[in-house]
Every structure is written in structure tokens, then in C-alpha cells.
A protein has these predicted regions:
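Residue-level signature of mid-helix packing/kink "hotspots" within the transmembrane helices
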Residues: 21, 49-57, 142-143, 253-261, ...
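Extracytoplasmic gate region of multi-pass secondary transporters
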Residues: 23-24, 205-257
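C-terminal ends and interior cores of transmembrane alpha-helices
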Residues: 77-91, 282-295
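Cytoplasmic helix-loop-helix junction between adjacent transmembrane helices
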Residues: 99-137
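C-terminal transmembrane helical hairpin of 12-TM major facilitator-type secondary transporters
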Residues: 271-319
């Protein structure tokens, strides 16, 4: 793949994805200002994912028929404008929920069309590495909004954080529209029942349900790791815990930018199932433990959190690569869309479930519930191996 194109798409996605978790970055501030419960905050986070799921199938079909560059650009624009409206008009639970729904609809136009371009422009031998770089830009972009919050919140307030991150998404739109990106293969073949059966074949379903378990854990953790670190530092008596909590959370999320490259590269060498199993078991172990560590030393909690941030995302590009490896090119956009819908349907639930158990339990219970839901993924990987389903083309 042309490295210039790969880095162009990755930089554009980095800019767009700052919208994804900018609400999580300001959550401790608006919870206090708007008198939100943890359950309500989790629902606002989940509403973004609902918008994503509602829109992603449309974008997936469109990316198989039309140049996905334009889905990417206009999705970024919608995400950015909805963020500007959030900064100007959000004043409570309902307005925040509606505007975050619009942001999710916009971001749906970025990830799957971008992944289709990367998958089809990459040779199979290095596809895992290329997709790892692209997913890494999602990770770093998502985490960067936490960094922006840590730096700007005291001077500019939560509105300033939303404003800066939303303008980044609008800049992404301009960057894509002004750039020359090779046109990937577009399908003139109608989507038939026979083609759809390939998308829902056993091997696809096992990969996709494994991905769903991964998404359940990942997006609950990403949504709540900032508030968790803020709370942890408050319990330790750290001055300006809000700033340090968000800065720590940004490091925890952004370390995943390295992890996705490493995970993609490892899948090229080890195979998909083996690489997924390594990372998912480590991240589940972190989910089971971190919420119960509030009395542990700061250095130990930060170390476990960094391991958590690395392992929880390292396998993410591998699920995308696995689908790309086993899917006919003419329906790749739809296949990636189906995977995304299934995975992100779980993310509509998990942040809200986390908030519910946090309201009625504690951090340990909330993280443990997330870990239990993630156990579906190693079971799916075991089923794939037992059935000897090949996940790489020979």
C-alpha cells in the first residue's frame, strides 16, 4: 500500500476520532453541573454508539457502490458540526443525548469506509500491519480528547474541550476532500442472497461474535477509565485530580496506538486466532482486577491500567483483518459493516450497564460485570480453532 495514502487516512481519522470520547473527557464536569447520575452518563455515551449502529450499514452499502472517500469526508463533517452544536446548546441529559446521537451517525461514515480503503489498497501479506496503523489512529485520536481535556478544562471549561475536538473533525473533512486517494474496487454486482449467505457463514459469525465481546469490554473501559482515574486520584488526595485523571486516562488509551500496530503485525506472523487469544485473555484479567485496586499504590494501579490500555485494543484490527481475509471483495464493505453493527450493538449497552452497576455497586463490581461479558470472545476463538476454520487465505 502507498504509505502516503495510509498515513493520510490515518491522520484524517485521528482528527475525526477526537469527537468519539470528548464527552467522556468532560463527564466528571457535566455530571456535577447537570446533576447526572452515572447511569444517565452511561446512557449518553451509549447513545453515540446507537447513532453509529443506525448509520453504519448505510455507509457500508454506499462504500461498496460509491467512492468511500466521500463517506469518510461527510461523516467527519457531520460529527464536527454536531460537536459544535453540543458546545453551544447542550444543557442537560436530553439535549446531550440527541446531539451525541448525531455525532455517532457522523463517525459511522469514517471508520468502516476508511477500513475498506485500507483493506483493499493493502497486499494480503502486510494487511494486518496496515490495518493496525489505521486502527491505531482511531485509538490515539480517541485518547487525545482526554489529553485536550486535561490541558484546557481549567482555562476553557468543558465547552472549550468540545469546541477544539469538534473543529478537528471538520479539519479532517477538508483534508480528505483536498487529497488524491486511489479509488478502490467498487461493486456493480447486486447484493444477492448467495452473497449475503457468505457474510453470515459460520466462520464470519464466530469472528464477529468474538469482535462483539471485544467491543463490549473496550468501549465500556474507554468510556469510564477517565472518571475512574479521577476518582482514584481523589481518593489518594491528589491535588487537581480532574486534570491528572484525564491526563493519565489519555496515556492509558493512547498507548493502544502502539498496541494495534503490534497486534496487526503479530497476526501476520502468528495467525489471527492465536494473536486474539493472547490479548483478550490479558485484557479480561485486567478487567477483573483493576476496579478492586483502589487501595493499591498509585504506581501499581497506573501500571495495570497501562497494561489494560495496551491489551484491550491490540486485537482490534485482527477482527477486521480476519473478515477481510475471508470475504469476497465485492461485499467487503457490507461484511465490515455487519461486523461493525454487531460489535457496536454491544457498545450501546455496556457503558450504560457499567454506569448502572457503579450506581448500585462500586468500581470493582462494574469492571467485573464487563469482564464477564467479554468471556464470549475466547469461547468463539476456541470454537474457531476446534472447527479448524482457516482465517487466512493461503
Amino acid at each position: 500500500m502507498n504509505l502516503r495514502v495510509l498515513w493520510l487516512l490515518s491522520i484524517a481519522q485521528f482528527l475525526s476520532m477526537q469527537v468519539w470520547f470528548n464527552f467522556s473527557a468532560i463527564m466528571p464536569l457535566v455530571q456535577e453541573q447537570w446533576q447526572l447520575s452515572s447511569t444517565q452518563s452511561g446512557i449518553i455515551v451509549a447513545t453515540f454508539h446507537l447513532g453509529y449502529v443506525l448509520a453504519v450499514i448505510f455507509y457500508s452499502f454506499a462504500s461498496d457502490k460509491y467512492n468511500p472517500k466521500y463517506s469518510f469526508a461527510y461523516g467527519s463533517l457531520v460529527a464536527g458540526i454536531s460537536g459544535l452544536l453540543f458546545a453551544a446548546f447542550a444543557e442537560g441529559f436530553w439535549s446531550a443525548m440527541i446531539l451525541r446521537l448525531l455525532s455517532g451517525i457522523g463517525i459511522a461514515g469514517v471508520y468502516v469506509p476508511g477500513m475498506k480503503m485500507v483493506a483493499q489498497l493493502s497486499p494480503p501479506a502486510s494487511r494486518g500491519k496496515a490495518m493496525g496503523i489505521f486502527v491505531g489512529s482511531l485509538v490515539v485520536g480517541s485518547g487525545f480528547s482526554l489529553f485536550v481535556s486535561g490541558v484546557l478544562q481549567n482555562a476553557w471549561g468543558w465547552q472549550g474541550v468540545i469546541l477544539v475536538t469538534s473543529c478537528a473533525a471538520i479539519l479532517s473533512c477538508a483534508l480528505i476532500l483536498m487529497s488524491k486517494i486511489p479509488v478502490v474496487s467498487l461493486s456493480s454486482t447486486p447484493v444477492t442472497l448467495a452473497l449475503l449467505k457468505k457474510i453470515v457463514a459460520k466462520k464470519n459469525l464466530l469472528v464477529n461474535f468474538g469482535y462483539a465481546g471485544h467491543c463490549w469490554e473496550l468501549y465500556a473501559m474507554w468510556a469510564w477509565i477517565g472518571p475512574f482515574m479521577v476518582y482514584f486520584y481523589q481518593q489518594k488526595g491528589i491535588a487537581d485530580a480532574l486534570t491528572w485523571g484525564n491526563l493519565s486516562a489519555s496515556s492509558i488509551v493512547m498507548i493502544g496506538g502502539i498496541a494495534t500496530y503490534f497486534g496487526g503485525m503479530l497476526s501476520d506472523r502468528w495467525g489471527n486466532v492465536r494473536a486474539i487469544r493472547l490479548f483478550i485473555l490479558l485484557s479480561i484479567a485486567c478487567s477483573f482486577s483493576i476496579g478492586w485496586m483502589l487501595l493499591a499504590p498509585i504506581w501499581l494501579v497506573v501500571a495495570v491500567a497501562l497494561l489494560y490500555g495496551f491489551t484491550i485494543i491490540a486485537d482490534s484490527p485482527i477482527y477486521n483483518k480476519a473478515i477481510a481475509d475471508i470475504t469476497d471483495p465485492e461485499v467487503l464493505g457490507v461484511a465490515l459493516g455487519v461486523q461493525s453493527v454487531l460489535g457496536f450493538s454491544f457498545t450501546i449497552i455496556s457503558p450504560a450497564v457499567f454506569g448502572l452497576f457503579l450506581d448500585h455497586g462500586n468500581w470493582g463490581v462494574a469492571f467485573t460485570v464487563i469482564a464477564l461479558g467479554t468471556l464470549i470472545t475466547p469461547f468463539c476463538m476456541r470454537a474457531l480453532q476446534a472447527a479448524e476454520v482457516p482465517l487466512e487465505r493461503s
